[in-house]
Amino acid sequence: MNSIRKLYCRAFQLVFRIALPFLPYREPKLLEGVQGVAELLARKNVNQVLLVTDKGIRSHGLTRPLEDALAKAGIGVSIFDDTVANPTVANVEAARRLYLDAGCRAIIAFGGGSSMDCAKACGARIARPNKPLAKMEGLLHVMRPLPLLIAVPTTAGTGSETTLAAVITDGESHHKYPINDFALIPPYALLDPEVTVGLPPQLTATTGMDAMTHAVEAYIGGSTTRGTRQAAVEAVRLILESLPVAYASGGDRTARAHMLRAAYLAGTAFTKSYVGYVHAVAHSLGGQYGIAHGLANAVLLPEVLEAYGPAAHKRLGRLAVEVGVASVNDTPAQASAKFIAKLRKMNADMGIPRTLEGIREEDLPALARHADHEGNPLYPVPVLMDANELQALYRLVMPKTEENTNDAAADRTGGAKAETILLDRQNTAAGVSHQSA
């Protein structure tokens, strides 16, 4: 990235950090059980609600206790369960039509990050009927109150019940629209470990590492605060302790509750401190190939942290010490290496691969442009990279073939697109792009 653009990105991030205490962040009020949801809607005089979920969740009967509680309270439920793994513009528009046709007055997001994002975007389109989702991409392009929104997460990963973000995919172009607005933060949430008990081990693993990514990227970024650091540290501790248990023993209610708490805390951390290039790259992969977001984050996280090099060592090393992965006697570089090794071991123990299948070399320029557009200047990453440099991050998680091995060799002999960029930037990061704590 050229010097002028670097200066612009850092100036943008500095202004945002200064403004942070004055921005209208809020944390959702936590409800007690499905009866608490019904009581809240009754107090708000809501007699018809839109329930946004997916067919898998409904087929397992997870929504039934909530549906029964609402019916007992005399509240009608219109169910939209066509949400797909990477929710599309078409999903959002179909949910919006159902909301309007049924005369709904509130929305319940019941599911993982996909259902949450679909519900948030549906609310945004109801609040902004004349503004398409493409025009809401970026920061603060909704700016209108949404209908009453209640979030019920069934995975412990996205933390969407606490965040101002939603990501929607254009089904035709595969472009992902990250929408960030304070209006998208749900005012109420229900954290119920019972609805996560049946989560399959592999989904438990990848969604848990999604929460880990939120916490780590929030902690090492340039917009971190004391409060977000505390939330991130507690989230990482809980994940290190409870994710292996939840993966191995899905019925362990304590581990499930701790993971919901971790995802919630990580969500509060990155809502204020933002994420980094792990997310920017993962979003582009999800949009282009349908790669699950949690899986992409899990595979990318240790590779990107290592690629940041010395620029991330101070903060990442401090995090490693605070969560007990490293010793106070370790240097920042040693502590960082131990933390990255811990992530790789967790992934391996839970069957998460080191690479992602299906990424095509010819797609890298377009993928990297999407990541560049999403990440810069918004994400306060330790090392700034432009689209050309970001291509290296994709190659780190591509299965090794003769073709991309030759590409990497060419880069090492003078090219400017892959691993040598990372090595060069690691050598210069401390003097050029290091983010002081």
Where are these regions (language model features)?
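Carboxylate- and glycine-rich phosphate/diphosphate-binding segment that chelates Mg2+/Mn2+
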Residues: 165-273
